[in-house]
Amino acid sequence: MKSSILLDGKAISEKIRNRIQETLAKAKAEGKGIPTLATILVGNNPASETYVNMKVKACEKVGMHSRYIRLKEETTTEELLGEIRKLNLDPSINGILLQHPVPHQIDERKAFDEIALEKDVDGVTTISFGKLSMNSEAYYPCTPYGMVLLLQEYGIDVTGKHAVVVGRSPILGKPMAIMLTNLNATVTLCHSKTEDLPSLVKQADIIVGAVGKPEFIKAEWMKEGVVILDAGYNVGNVGDIEVSKAKDKSSYYTPVPGGVGPMTISVLLLQTMYSFLGQFSPKLESHVANR
């Protein structure tokens, strides 16, 4: 069997960011201005602060403005909705990101759904999810879309392949299952109540780890030649899949870190650029007709 190929999220991410930088420099030279991404952080979660700072720096690097709105831990749902409404009405703001998770007293779903569709560059609103499920143009959840772009950059055709997605969160597992379906894969969506998970994983041509548990998906469950996409990032720099043991039997695999993670922020920047240019992310299409 040929050696497995590492899906280099860092390299592909850099390629995407260079393209964004070139497009925005051209737009600025033509007098079209500069896009702005607004990020809201509620509370004092250290991990969230780190993620937000990474996004702010990434914006600056590609020539994008960022607006960082910091709200106190005790913020109510209504106060947060008020901040989002202000950003919805601000013509200088092209994208709005509400950093997840929010403190327990806030209705996160209500807050997500307050974001204007044309500024939902993180793909978190119910309407964006519905548009994705209908394979209409939309902004997509950034992590699953990043995985799809990785597959496409490496020329991996999922048509007719059996993809097993482990994890059903509304911003990761579920949208990934829909995206793969839209690209003509046959998808099994698994979760914590799934019976005999190892036998399902054994059938997978493509395995997606999106369960949030360190190395939960074992190497021994997988068949030779599988494509491994690990969206997890846990303590100890490990994902949701036993990649260190499974990579030798894979055809392609994402490392942790350096695989899916860099793609997430790049997709956020990409979709903010699309919003600035007045368009949605392109509809997911395969070379095989939908039927």
UniProtKB/Swiss-Prot annotation:
Catalysed reaction equations from the record: (6R)-5,10-methylene-5,6,7,8-tetrahydrofolate + NADP(+) = (6R)-5,10-methenyltetrahydrofolate + NADPH; (6R)-5,10-methenyltetrahydrofolate + H2O = (6R)-10-formyltetrahydrofolate + H(+)
GO MF, any single term: methylenetetrahydrofolate dehydrogenase (NADP+) activity
GO cellular component terms given for this protein: cytosol
EC number: 1.5.1.5, 3.5.4.9
Biochemical pathway: One-carbon metabolism; tetrahydrofolate interconversion
Protein's UniProt keywords contain Acetylation: no
Keywords attached to this entry: Amino-acid biosynthesis, Histidine biosynthesis, Hydrolase, Methionine biosynthesis, Multifunctional enzyme, NADP, One-carbon metabolism, Oxidoreductase, Purine biosynthesis
Positions that bind NADP(+): 167-169, 192
GO BP: any one term: tetrahydrofolate interconversion
InterPro entries: Aminoacid_DH-like_N_sf, NAD(P)-bd_dom_sf, THF_DH/CycHdrlase, THF_DH/CycHdrlase_cat_dom, THF_DH/CycHdrlase_CS, THF_DH/CycHdrlase_NAD-bd_dom
Subunit structure: Homodimer.
Function: Catalyzes the oxidation of 5,10-methylenetetrahydrofolate to 5,10-methenyltetrahydrofolate and then the hydrolysis of 5,10-methenyltetrahydrofolate to 10-formyltetrahydrofolate.
Homology family: Belongs to the tetrahydrofolate dehydrogenase/cyclohydrolase family.
Name this protein carries in UniProt: Bifunctional protein FolD
Annotated organism of origin: Leptospira biflexa serovar Patoc (strain Patoc 1 / ATCC 23582 / Paris)
Lineage summary: Bacteria, Pseudomonadati, Spirochaetota, Spirochaetia, Leptospirales
Name of the gene: folD
